[in-house]
Swiss-Prot record:
Keyword Protein biosynthesis: yes
UniProt-annotated binding residues for (6S)-5,6,7,8-tetrahydrofolate: 110-113
Functional description taken from the UniProt entry: Attaches a formyl group to the free amino group of methionyl-tRNA(fMet). The formyl group appears to play a dual role in the initiator identity of N-formylmethionyl-tRNA by promoting its recognition by IF2 and preventing the misappropriation of this tRNA by the elongation apparatus.
Keywords associated with the record: Protein biosynthesis, Transferase
Family annotation (CDD domains): FMT_core_Met-tRNA-FMT_N, Met_tRNA_FMT_C
Pfam family, one: Formyl_trans_N
Keyword Transferase applies: yes
UniProt record similarity statement: Belongs to the Fmt family.
PANTHER family, per the entry: METHIONYL-TRNA FORMYLTRANSFERASE, METHIONYL-TRNA FORMYLTRANSFERASE, MITOCHONDRIAL
Chain's gene name: fmt
Stored InterPro entries: Fmt, Formyl_trans_C, Formyl_transf_N, Formyl_transf_N_sf, Formyl_transferase-like_C_sf, Met-tRNA-FMT_C, Met-tRNA-FMT_N
Organism for this UniProt entry: Nocardia farcinica (strain IFM 10152)
Protein name: Methionyl-tRNA formyltransferase
Amino acid sequence: MRLVFAGTPEPAVPSLRRLIASPRHEVVAVVTRPDAVAGRGRKITRSPIAALADEHGIPVLSPRTPAEPEFLDRLTELAPDCCPVVAYGALLPQAALDIPRHGWINLHFSLLPAWRGAAPVQAAINAGEEITGATTFQIEAGLDSGPVYGVVTEKIDVTDTAGTLLERLAETGARLLETTLDGVEDGTLQAVPQPTEGVSYAPKVTPEDGRIRWDQPALAVNRRIRAVTPAPGAWTLVGGNRLKLGPVELVEEQLPERVIEVRKSGVFVGTATTAVRLDKVQPQGKKMMPALDWARGARLQPGAVVE
């Protein structure tokens, strides 16, 4: 099939790479978000999808909004049979959805109808789920509500962060997306409506969501940190200064809530239940470092607390 692929961030790359290599399909263009300022140098950066398309000489379309008439005209000229989507990052108008004869097929990183929305991987970890997965479905007007073509499951390890889990889902999901497109082309795959029960939503995660609430149980603290790692990142305040947190270890010891205790064996913080041991932390303006190194340099006073 003639494909116009829509995607933007790194997790979309395995899918595009797989479809470029497919002997059955031809990627005639990609649609991605416009170049953006990124990094400490504040340089204009192309999206990972645009960069991969450039490597293969594939035309790149970067409309400010997919409702632009110029974009819709260009998409019509390309005459795609289908438009696969992986984390594109913008809502598609009905005028765009109507152009390809097989519509737009989205790869979503959850087991729909659970965790519709922008941050399904983070939501699954934060909820303490043991199994998640990826789903391919036909895009329609509702939010991630279209009929489903296929699913694949993935175990959530107790040490998984959003980053490690999404990396695996991006690879397994890419295989699912290719299989789905093959079935759609052959006419052997029919989409089925999503269940009306079990619907949940996963809104975009903000930097404020990364602030850790130490009045929560240790298990909830652990899950929250893993869910926002690597982005937007977990953080707390110590002496009024922001401290970024890496994943923590659950321990059996008790400490008063929010109290920091420095020992030879590590840096511990009290929660609503048991304590957690900090692994790596990042003070403002510095790199990630072992928590003990930070604590020694910070010269914390007895009874110091996280805020």
